[in-house]
C-alpha cells in the first residue's frame, strides 16, 4: 500500500500521534474475500510484543487482523500519563490501521470458540470414559490372573499333597512287606553279634541237657548252632532283616506254619552231638512246567519244584466221562424273550430262540407248510412258533426306531418364553417381500429374479419398542408354490395376510386364508399399498367377509392394520399387534434339550455341499450335533444366520442354514438331534426303505393303468415331450413339476425323465441324449464337462431364473407337438347342366355357379341326392375355352376333377378351401 504523504508536498508537519518506539513489524499483503463475491487486498502486520520489568501482564495475544490502507488509525488509549506503551507500534507516515471485526465475523468467531470448547469437553469426556473402561478392563484382567494363579497354586498344592501321601503309602508298604531299604554291610565280626537280636531274652539252658535235644528251644534264624559256636563268614547277619519281620522275612500278621515254629530242619550228628540246620533247598527257575526228564526217583520226586499236571490222555478220559454223564442227564429248557419284527427269516428266528432251525422247519411241516431256513415269515407266524416252543414274545415294528425323536413332553418348570414365528402370505405382487424389507431395513426384492419371490425365506426382526425378536417366514405368492405356502403355515404361530388395497382379494389370497384356517393359527390382515391414489381399504374388508374373515372394525376378532411398505407407514403398529398376539398365545418351550425343527428349504450348493434352511422349534441346535432329517443324516459343520453370521448354536424360533448333511433333505422334513450315529443310521435306513417300498407300491399299482395307457397311446397317438429338469432348491423343483403336470392334455404331455436338485452334470446330458430330450436348468448352470458334452452331441440346455418364463416356453414347445386344426371355408356351389366327353381330357361338366365363387385348385365335393360321392380337387376351370382362376355366381363354366369322371346331370358341386390353424395349449 502507498503511504499517506502526497508526492511533492514539502511542508513540515508535526505528527499528531503519540511518540512510541517502533517495534519490529513484519508486513505482508493478502486478498480478503467478502460476501456476494467482493474481495479486497489488505496489509497484514505481524507484531512481536515485549515484556518489561515492572509492567503488568501483557494483553492476551490476538490473531492478526486485516489492515485498512487509507484510514488513519485512532490514537490508542493509555492508562499511563507519559512514556511509551510497551505493545504499541508506530507506522512512520504509513497511515495503516487495524480494521475492527464486523458483527457477523464476531458471531462466527464466538460460535467457533463455542464449538471448540464443546469439542474439547466431548474429547475430555471420551478420554475419561476410555480411561475408566481401561481401568475396569485391567482390574478384571488382574482379578482373572490372580484367580488363575490361585487355582494353579491350589492345584500344585493338591498334587504335592497327593504325591506326599503316595510316597508315604509306598514307604509304609515297603516297611510292612520287607521291601524297604537295602541291607547295611556288617561292620563287626559275626561271632561278636548277640545271639538274639529280634527275639526277647530267654532263660539259660539247663545243664546236662544237650544242645539240640528234643526238649530244647529252637535257636533264632540269625544264630545257627555250629560245632564251635562260630557263624560262617559269608552268612547274612540277623540285623539285616527289617524290623518287625517274622521268621524268614514273613510279613507281619502272617501266621507261621508248624515248620516255622520248630525252626529249620536239622540234621542229627549223634546222641550227644550238636545239630546243624539242613542246607536250604535249591531253587530252580524254569520258564514253565516241563515233563520230568530222566529216571524218576524218590529224591528227584521230593525235591522237584514242578507241580505234576494231568496228562493229555487223562484229560481226554475225564472229558469223555463228563460227556457220558451229561448225555444221561436231562437238560433244563431255557425260556427266552424273543423279539420279533414285522418280517424275519427262519434262521434268524431260530437263533433268537436258541433253537435248531431244523426243529423250527419240522414244526412248520407239521402245520402243512414247507419252508427253507432262508424263507421270510411274517410276525404272526413267528409268534405262533415261538409260543409253541415255550418262549415269550415281544412284538416290535420297524417304525419303533422313530420313537422318542419328536413330540417329547417337556416339564412345565423347564420352559421359557420364545419368539413368535410369523408367516407372511398373500397374492403375488401384493407387497409381501417389500413389507419384510421395510421391517428388516433390507432389500431382498432386488435380489429375486423378476422381482418375485421363488424361495421361502426366514428372517429375524427385533421390535423397536419391546426389543423382542420376531421370526418372519416369507412365502411365494403365485399359484405354482402351493406346497411352499402349506409348509409355511404348518410351522407358524401367526399368519400375516397381506392384501393390496388397490387390488383386493385374489385367488392366492383365498388359498392363504384356507391354509391359515387348516393350520388353526391366528391371522392378522395387513392392508398394504394405502399410499396409492386408488387404494380402497374398506373394499378389502368387505371382500374378506365373503371368506369368513371378519376384522375388528366390522365387529370381528381378526386384527387389521393399514400399512405402506413403500412409505413405511404403520409398521410399528403392525409389530405391536404381532407382539400382542404372541403374548396372548403365551409361547413357551424348553431350550435345554436336543433340538427339533423343520426343514424350510434345501439345496445343493457347489461349494458348500447340501445346505438346508431349518427353523428350530424346540431345544438348541449346536455345531457337532448328529442330526436326522427325512432319509438324510449328518453332523452339523456350521450354522449360518440370515445375516450371514456364523453361529455356534441356535435356540428356539431361530432360522439358520445348516451345513453337514450327507444329501439335501426334502423341504418339509422334520429335523431331530440323535444321540449317536448308530441311531441316525437306523432311522435313515428305515425311512429310505419305506420310501422305496412306497415307490414300488405305486409302480405296481399302476401296472394295470399303465397297460391301458399304452394302448391308448397306440390308438390315440399321444405325444410326449421329454425333459430333464435341474433346480437349485427342492421347493422350486416341486413348483416346476406341478406346473408342467397341469400342461398335459390327452394329445400331448411332458415326460420328466429326471428331476433333481443341483447343477447339470454329464450324466444328465447322457440321459437327455438317449431320449432326445431337452435339459432345463432353473437357477443352476452346467459344469464345464457337461456343457462341452451337450454342445458336442447337439443337446439343448435352456437356463431360466423365472418360473413363468420356463412354463411359457415349455408350453409353446408342447403346442408344436399338437396336430393342427383344419377349418373349411365355403366358397360356392355349382350345378351340373351337361356332361361332355372330350378326348385327351376326359369328362368335363358344364355347370352354372348358383352362389358364391368357384376357384381353380380348390377342394370340391360332388353331391348326388344329398350324398357325398366324391371329394377331390378342381383341376380345370374354363369359361368360353379360356382358363380362368375363378367364376362368379350366375355364370356358366366348365369343370373337370382330378382322377374322377363319374359326373351326372343334376349333381351339385361344393367348392371350399381348407385352412390349417396351429393349436396351442
Curated annotation (Swiss-Prot):
tr-type G domain segment(s): 417-586
Binding residue positions for GTP: 426-433, 474-478, 528-531
Region (G5): 564-566
Stretches the record annotates as G4: 528-531
Positions of region (G2): 451-455
Pfam families listed in its UniProt record: EF-G_D2, GTP_EFTU, GTP_EFTU_D2, IF-2, IF2_assoc, IF2_N
Gene Ontology MF terms: GTP binding; GTPase activity; guanosine tetraphosphate binding; translation initiation factor activity
Keywords: Cytoplasm, GTP-binding, Initiation factor, Nucleotide-binding, Protein biosynthesis
Region entry Disordered, spans: 1-296
Amino acid composition bias (Low complexity), ranges on this chain: 80-89, 183-257
Region (G1): 426-433
Presence of the UniProt keyword Transit peptide in the record: no
Protein name: Translation initiation factor IF-2
Species the sequence originates in: Bradyrhizobium sp. (strain BTAi1 / ATCC BAA-1182)
Gene label: infB
Amino acid at each position: 500500500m502507498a503511504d499517506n504523504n502526497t508526492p511533492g508536498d514539502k511542508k513540515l508537519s508535526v505528527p499528531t500521534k503519540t511518540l512510541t518506539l517502533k517495534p519490529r513489524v513484519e508486513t505482508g499483503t493478502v486478498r480478503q474475500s467478502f460476501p456476494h463475491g467482493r474481495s479486497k487486498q489488505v496489509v497484514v502486520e505481524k507484531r512481536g510484543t515485549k515484556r518489561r520489568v515492572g509492567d503488568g501482564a501483557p494483553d492476551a495475544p490476538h490473531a492478526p487482523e486485516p489492515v485498512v490502507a487509507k484510514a488513519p488509525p485512532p490514537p490508542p488509549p493509555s492508562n499511563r500519563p507519559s512514556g511509551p506503551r510497551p505493545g504499541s507500534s508506530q507506522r512512520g507516515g504509513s497511515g495503516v490501521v487495524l480494521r475492527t471485526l464486523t458483527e457477523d465475523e464476531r458471531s462466527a468467531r464466538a460460535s467457533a470458540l463455542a464449538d471448540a470448547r464443546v469439542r474439547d469437553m466431548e474429547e475430555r469426556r471420551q478420554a475419561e470414559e476410555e480411561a475408566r473402561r481401561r481401568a475396569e478392563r485391567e482390574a478384571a484382567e488382574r482379578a482373572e490372573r490372580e484367580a488363575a494363579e490361585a487355582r494353579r497354586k491350589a492345584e500344585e498344592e493338591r498334587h504335592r499333597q497327593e504325591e506326599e501321601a503316595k510316597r508315604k503309602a509306598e514307604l509304609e508298604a515297603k516297611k510292612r512287606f520287607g521291601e524297604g531299604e537295602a541291607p547295611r554291610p556288617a561292620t563287626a565280626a559275626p561271632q561278636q553279634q548277640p545271639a538274639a537280636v529280634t527275639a526277647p531274652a530267654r532263660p539259660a539252658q539247663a545243664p546236662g541237657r544237650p544242645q539240640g535235644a528234643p526238649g530244647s528251644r529252637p535257636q533264632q534264624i540269625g544264630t545257627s548252632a555250629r560245632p564251635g559256636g562260630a557263624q560262617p563268614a559269608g552268612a547274612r547277619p540277623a540285623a539285616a532283616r527289617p524290623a518287625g519281620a517274622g521268621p524268614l522275612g514273613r510279613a507281619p500278621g502272617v501266621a507261621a506254619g508248624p515248620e516255622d515254629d520248630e525252626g529249620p530242619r536239622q540234621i542229627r550228628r549223634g546222641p550227644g552231638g550238636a545239630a546243624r540246620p539242613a542246607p536250604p533247598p535249591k531253587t530252580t527257575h524254569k520258564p514253565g512246567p516241563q515233563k520230568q526228564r530222566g529216571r524218576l526217583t524218590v529224591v528227584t520226586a521230593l525235591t522237584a519244584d514242578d507241580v505234576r499236571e494231568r496228562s493229555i490222555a487223562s484229560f481226554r478220559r475225564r472229558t469223555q466221562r463228563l460227556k457220558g454223564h451229561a448225555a444221561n442227564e436231562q437238560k433244563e429248557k431255557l425260556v427266552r424273550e424273543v423279539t420279533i419284527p414285522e418280517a424275519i427269516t427262519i434262521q434268524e428266528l431260530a437263533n433268537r430262540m436258541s433253537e435248531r432251525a431244523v426243529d423250527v422247519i419240522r414244526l412248520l411241516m407239521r402245520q402243512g407248510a414247507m419252508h427253507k431256513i432262508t424263507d421270510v415269515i411274517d410276525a404272526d407266524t413267528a409268534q405262533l412258533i415261538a409260543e409253541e416252543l415255550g418262549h415269550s414274545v415281544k412284538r416290535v415294528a420297524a417304525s419303533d426306531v422313530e420313537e422318542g425323536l419328536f413330540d417329547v413332553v417337556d416339564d412345565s418348570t423347564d420352559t421359557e418364553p420364545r419368539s413368535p414365528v410369523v408367516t407372511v402370505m398373500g397374492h403375488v405382487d401384493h407387497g409381501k417381500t417389500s413389507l419384510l424389507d421395510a421391517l428388516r431395513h433390507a432389500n431382498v426384492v432386488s435380489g429375486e429374479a423378476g422381482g418375485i419371490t421363488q424361495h421361502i425365506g426366514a428372517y429375524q426382526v427385533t421390535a423397536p419398542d419391546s426389543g423382542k425378536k420376531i421370526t418372519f417366514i416369507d412365502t411365494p405368492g403365485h399359484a405354482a408354490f402351493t406346497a411352499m405356502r402349506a409348509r409355511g403355515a404348518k410351522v407358524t404361530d401367526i399368519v400375516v395376510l397381506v392384501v393390496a388395497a388397490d387390488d383386493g382379494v385374489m385367488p392366492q389370497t383365498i388359498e392363504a386364508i384356507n391354509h391359515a384356517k387348516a393350520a388353526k393359527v391366528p391371522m392378522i390382515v395387513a392392508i398394504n399399498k394405502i399410499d396409492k391414489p386408488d387404494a380402497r381399504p374398506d373394499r378389502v374388508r368387505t371382500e374378506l367377509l365373503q371368506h369368513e374373515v371378519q376384522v375388528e372394525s366390522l365387529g370381528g376378532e381378526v386384527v387389521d392394520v393399514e400399512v405402506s411398505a413403500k412409505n413405511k407407514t404403520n409398521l410399528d403398529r403392525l409389530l405391536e399387534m404381532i407382539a400382542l398376539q404372541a403374548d396372548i398365545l403365551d409361547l413357551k418351550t424348553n431350550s435345554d434339550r436336543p433340538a427339533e425343527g423343520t426343514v424350510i428349504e434345501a439345496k445343493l450348493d457347489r461349494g458348500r455341499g447340501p445346505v438346508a434352511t431349518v427353523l428350530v422349534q424346540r431345544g438348541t441346535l449346536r455345531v457337532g450335533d448328529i442330526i436326522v432329517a427325512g432319509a438324510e443324516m449328518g453332523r452339523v459343520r456350521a450354522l449360518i444366520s440370515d445375516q450371514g453370521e456364523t453361529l455356534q448354536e441356535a435356540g428356539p424360533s431361530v432360522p439358520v442354514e445348516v451345513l453337514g448333511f450327507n444329501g439335501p433333505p426334502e423341504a418339509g422334513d422334520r429335523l431331530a438331534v440323535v444321540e449317536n450315529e448308530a441311531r441316525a443310521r437306523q432311522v435313515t435306513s428305515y425311512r429310505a426303505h419305506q420310501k422305496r417300498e412306497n415307490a414300488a407300491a405305486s409302480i405296481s399299482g399302476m401296472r394295470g393303468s399303465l397297460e391301458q395307457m399304452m394302448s391308448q397311446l397306440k390308438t390315440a397317438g399321444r405325444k410326449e415331450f421329454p425333459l430333464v429338469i435341474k433346480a437349485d432348491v427342492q421347493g422350486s423343483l416341486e413348483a416346476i413339476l406341478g406346473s408342467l403336470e397341469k400342461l398335459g392334455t390327452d394329445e400331448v404331455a411332458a415326460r420328466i425323465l429326471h428331476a433333481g436338485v443341483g447343477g447339470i452334470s454329464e450324466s444328465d446330458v447322457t440321459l437327455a441324449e438317449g431320449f432326445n430330450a431337452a435339459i432345463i436348468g432353473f437357477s443352476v448352470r452346467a459344469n464345464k464337462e457337461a456343457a462341452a458334452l451337450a454342445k458336442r452331441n447337439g443337446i439343448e440346455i435352456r437356463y431360466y431364473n423365472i418360473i413363468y418364463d420356463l412354463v411359457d416356453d415349455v408350453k409353446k414347445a408342447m403346442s408344436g407337438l399338437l396336430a393342427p386344426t383344419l377349418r373349411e371355408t365355403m366358397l360356392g356351389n355349382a350345378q351340373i347342366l351337361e356332361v361332355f366327353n372330350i378326348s385327351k381330357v376326359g369328362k368335363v361338366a358344364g355347370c352354372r355357379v348358383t352362389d358364391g365363387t368357384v376357384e381353380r385348385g380348390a377342394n370340391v365335393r360332388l353331391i348326388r341326392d344329398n350324398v357325398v360321392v366324391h371329394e377331390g380337387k378342381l383341376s380345370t376351370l374354363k369359361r368360353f375355352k379360356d382358363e380362368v382362376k375363378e367364376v362368379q355366381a350366375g355364370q356358366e363354366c366348365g369343370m373337370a376333377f382330378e382322377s374322377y369322371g363319374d359326373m351326372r346331370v343334376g349333381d351339385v358341386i361344393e367348392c371350399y378351401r381348407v385352412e390349417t390353424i396351429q393349436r396351442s395349449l
